[in-house]
Curated annotation (Swiss-Prot):
This is Adenylosuccinate synthetase. Belongs to the adenylosuccinate synthetase family. PANTHER family: ADENYLOSUCCINATE SYNTHETASE. Homodimer. It comes from Saccharophagus degradans (strain 2-40 / ATCC 43961 / DSM 17024).
């Protein structure tokens, strides 16, 4: 009997999902992306070699694994072809193993132009998007005017739809944002050229997933970003434009929720965030600087320096609930090595001292003050540990306390960037 496992981030992204997906892929026949676009970066380190993926599932580095991009992913043909060519230049076979849903909404140059124009107009109130057209592409999908990958299979139909939607967006670009219009013919020619390369990879992803399930094969669903960036459950409006939570797995792939066996929450041992938005436990001091430098906290997609802070158990417990998580994988434990004291946010209070729960808007988040619990740190190194017995007792106590606070066990603990630097207490595909 096969198992179907979802891997998600429990924080604001950058939790280390890429390494864990790569580790788990050894057991599966298929890996599927179900939301987001090329705004997310998945960094893998295998035998010392670093690979950064943005659209293609991390399982592409494994032989015999089919990688799928489901209908919930907004797809930039240009970004995808570039990523394919980069992998091929490094000797990785991609095209025969990658399958694309024809229902994927397309990201085209006018989406990028809109994204950049909006952020520029917002000024200091900007959301902090990656400027890659993700939000505008999802807007087109919801408004039912968006072009989809399957439209490229009929060039005349694609050209007609493009003319209509580009007229709409060029009006906004020129008349509201004061930006330059996007050239129709350039967009059309480039899209058709790239579409010809993508056409052989277009497949019925829904049917392929269910055929694998019926054949008793293991399937892994790879989430992007993190639960606190979810369009509905995140720190709105400082969120992404898709459902990054477990519910998005079903809608973004066509794989029913009752078929999912295990939801693994990837959880950093401290907290980071890229760009604007609420961050109750942020540290603007030497400890925060230490976490950023030791953790190499720079975005895989944008290169922007990440903000750093203590572990927020309130936020992670919220993520556990909305995802019905089975267990967590604790990553970057080694970054806390050398600290004499570690703190955990165990509650929120407002400016009047009243205990509060998870706010529902930016104004509510602005009033949040963290309530901390302190624990002894550890000086011994945790780097490369493969068993709990190799960890300092203080590190073990820290892990156990996090388990108590968020309500799920730490089934996997990552002690370094390489896949072998991992403690596996309960394997999602074996337990």
């Amino acid at each position: 009997m096969g198992k179907n496992v979802v891997v998600l981030g429990t924080q604001w992204g950058d939790e280390g999902k890429g390494k864990i997906v790569d580790l788990l892929t050894e057991k599966v026949s298929q890996v599927a992306r179900f939301q987001g676009g090329h705004n997310a970066g998945h960094t893998l380190v295998i035998e010392g070699k670093k690979t950064v993926l943005h659209l293609i599932p991390s399982g592409i580095l494994h032989d015999g694994v089919t990688c799928m991009i489901g209908n919930g992913v907004v797809l930039s043909p240009e970004a995808l072809i570039k990523e394919i060519e980069e992998l091929e230049a490094n000797g990785v076979e991609v095209r025969s193993k990658l399958k694309l849903s024809p229902a994927c909404p397309l990201i085209l140059p006018y989406h990028v132009a809109l994204d950049l124009a909006r952020e520029s107009k917002r000024g200091d109130a900007k959301i902090g998007t990656t400027g890659r057209g993700i939000g505008p592409a999802y807007e087109d999908k919801v408004s039912r005017r968006g072009l989809r990958l399957g439209d490229l299979l009929n060039e005349q139909r694609f050209a007609a739809k493009l003319a209509e939607v580009l007229e709409y967006h060029n009006f906004a670009l020129t008349q509201y944002y004061g930006a330059e219009p996007v050239d129709y013919q350039e967009v059309l020619n480039k899209a058709l050229e790239l579409g010809a390369q993508l056409r052989p990879m277009i497949a019925d992803v829904v049917d392929m997933l269910h055929t694998s399930r019926e054949n008793g094969e293991h399937i892994l669903f790879e989430g992007a970003q993190g639960s606190l960036l979810d369009i509905d459950h995140g720190t709105y409006p400082f969120v992404t434009s898709s459902n990054t939570t477990a519910g998005g797995t079903a809608t973004g792939s066509g794989f029913g929720p009752l078929y999912l066996d295990y939801v693994l929450g990837i959880t950093k041992a401290y907290t980071t965030r890229v760009g604007s938005g609420p961050f109750p436990t942020e540290l603007e001091c030497d400890v925060g600087k230490h976490l950023g430098e030791k953790g190499h906290e720079f975005g895989a997609t944008t290169g922007r320096q990440r903000r750093t802070g203590w572990f927020d158990a309130v936020a992670v417990r919220h993520a556990v609930r909305i995802n019905s998580m089975t267990g967590m994988c604790l990553t970057k434990l080694d970054v806390l090595d050398g600290l004499s004291e570690v703190k955990i946010c165990v509650g929120y209070k407002d400016s009047n001292g009243a205990v509060i729960g998870i706010p529902c808007d930016a104004e509510g988040w602005a009033d949040v003050q963290p309530v901390y619990e302190s624990m002894p740190g550890w000086t011994a190194s945790t780097v490369g540990a493969k068993t709990m017995e190799e960890l300092p007792v203080e590190a073990v106590n820290y892990i156990r306390r996090l388990e108590e606070l968020v309500g799920i066990p730490a089934d996997i603990i990552s002690t370094g960037p390489d896949r072998v630097e991992t403690i596996v207490l309960r394997h999602p595909f074996e337990g």
